[in-house]
């Protein structure tokens, strides 16, 4: 959800960019956690490629946005949220940068 939220914010707000190497490192660390819990690379890839799982992640992301007073359909609110996340240096903010 963290990567999905950061990605949506960076795509919706022209004045916020993504720290793509950080996002890739974070994604790789999540894969390592899954491997350490016994999941195979094939299982991990199937999960990541699943349309149903992607829909669940989008729904959780949108609920997070709503809880923060933003909307996935309102670019201005996502910009405000993005700057707040950057200022807090949250997990989402760590993956974003002001341009």
Residue ranges, per PLM feature:
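Conserved glycine-rich, hydrophobic/aromatic-active-site segments
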Residues: 1, 21, 25-28
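Generic signature of mature, soluble extracytoplasmic domains
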Residues: 11, 21-22, 35
């Amino acid at each position: 959800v963290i990567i999905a939220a950061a990605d949506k914010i960076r795509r919706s707000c022209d004045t916020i960019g993504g720290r793509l190497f950080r996002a890739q490192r974070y994604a790789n660390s999540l894969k390592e956690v899954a491997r350490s819990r016994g999941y195979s690379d094939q299982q991990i890839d199937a999960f990541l490629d699943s349309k149903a799982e992607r829909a669940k992640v989008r729904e959780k992301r949108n609920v997070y946005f709503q809880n923060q007073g933003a909307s996935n359909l309102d670019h201005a609110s996502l910009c405000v949220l993005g700057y707040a996340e950057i200022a807090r240096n949250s997990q989402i903010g760590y993956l974003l940068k002001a341009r």
